[in-house]
Curated annotation (Swiss-Prot):
The protein, known as: Kunitz-type serine protease inhibitor conotoxin Cal9.1b
Key words of the record: Disulfide bond, Protease inhibitor, Secreted, Serine protease inhibitor, Toxin
Disulfide bond found in the keyword field: yes
GO cellular component, as recorded: extracellular space
Domain BPTI/Kunitz inhibitor: 7-57
MF-aspect GO terms: serine-type endopeptidase inhibitor activity; toxin activity
Tissues expressing this chain: Expressed by the venom duct.
Keyword match Metal-binding: no
CDD domains in the record: Kunitz-type
Domain remarks in the Swiss-Prot or TrEMBL record: The cysteine framework is IX (C-C-C-C-C-C).
Length: 60
């Protein structure tokens, strides 16, 4: 997978309950959104900052 491939993945919150605020790219809207990540598992469509999300997936 390339870095851009993660932009196509749906956000997965994972099964844990840490409630970490992260950003994920929403391919349907074409925007990065703030979401809650559980802290374990999930996939690569998860970014610590909006800037990281935008830099990876903007204009995708």
């Amino acid at each position: 997978r390339t870095k851009r491939d993660v932009c196509e993945l749906p956000f997965e919150e994972g099964p844990c309950f840490a409630a970490i605020r992260v950003y994920a790219y929403n391919a349907e809207t074409g925007d990065c959104e703030q979401l809650t990540y559980g802290g374990c598992e999930g996939n690569g469509n998860r970014f610590a900052t909006l800037e990281d999300c935008d830099n990876t997936c903007a204009r995708y």
